[in-house]
């Protein structure tokens, strides 16, 4: 849904009449993944459906029907969604939505740098990063689960695609991916 919100924000910033025509639809899309009012009887959507305020990042499915719990592989898509909220909030003058987007973006980026990219070198264990075992010599986790991390994608074991799942789409909101020159 983040792709739709981001695109809608881009159009809305250039064509204010777009908002008048499509605001209700866009607000429904946002509500589905980013409802920020807890215990709101007027909302048909759960509070921050895919985002865990405890973990500080999104989960791909929002459920834990896997042996290792929830999972998230496309951290960059989540970040793109939060950037879309910021832009849409700006385009519509909705300060609450802008603030929510800023919180989610900053929190998700911090978690991605920690859990996926391990930029401080204190999350991924030596067996994973230093050549001991089947998951040896990986500089990052491509998929984070509730109970493990892996270097894989659902459809391939090709490294370029595995890397790509956590950097695409590349937008101005992707600056975090290049902020650490050593990584």
Where are these predicted regions, by residue range?
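Well-ordered alpha-helical segments within folded domains of soluble proteins
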Residues: 1-10, 73-87, 139-140
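Ser/Thr/Asn(+Pro)-rich, low-complexity disordered segments
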Residues: 1, 23-63, 67, 86-96, ...
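Short, solvent-exposed segments of well-ordered alpha helices
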Residues: 20, 65-75
């Amino acid at each position: 849904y983040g792709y739709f919100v981001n695109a809608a924000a881009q159009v809305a910033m250039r064509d204010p009449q777009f908002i008048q025509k499509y605001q209700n639809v866009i607000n429904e899309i946002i509500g589905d993944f980013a409802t920020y009012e807890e215990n709101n009887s007027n909302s048909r959507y759960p509070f921050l459906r895919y985002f865990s305020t405890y973990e500080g990042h999104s989960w791909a499915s929002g459920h834990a029907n896997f042996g290792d719990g929830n999972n998230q592989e496309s951290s960059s898509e989540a970040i793109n969604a939060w950037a879309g909220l910021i832009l849409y909030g700006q385009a519509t003058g909705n300060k609450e939505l802008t603030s929510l987007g800023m919180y989610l973006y900053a929190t998700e980026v911090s978690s991605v740098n920690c859990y996926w990219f391990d930029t401080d070198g204190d999350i991924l264990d030596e067996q994973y990063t230093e050549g001991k075992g089947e998951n040896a010599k990986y500089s990052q986790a491509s998929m984070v689960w509730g109970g493990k991390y892996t270097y894989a994608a659902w459809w391939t074991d090709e490294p370029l695609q595995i890397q790509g799942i956590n950097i695409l789409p590349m937008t101005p909101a992707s600056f975090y991916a290049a902020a650490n020159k050593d990584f």
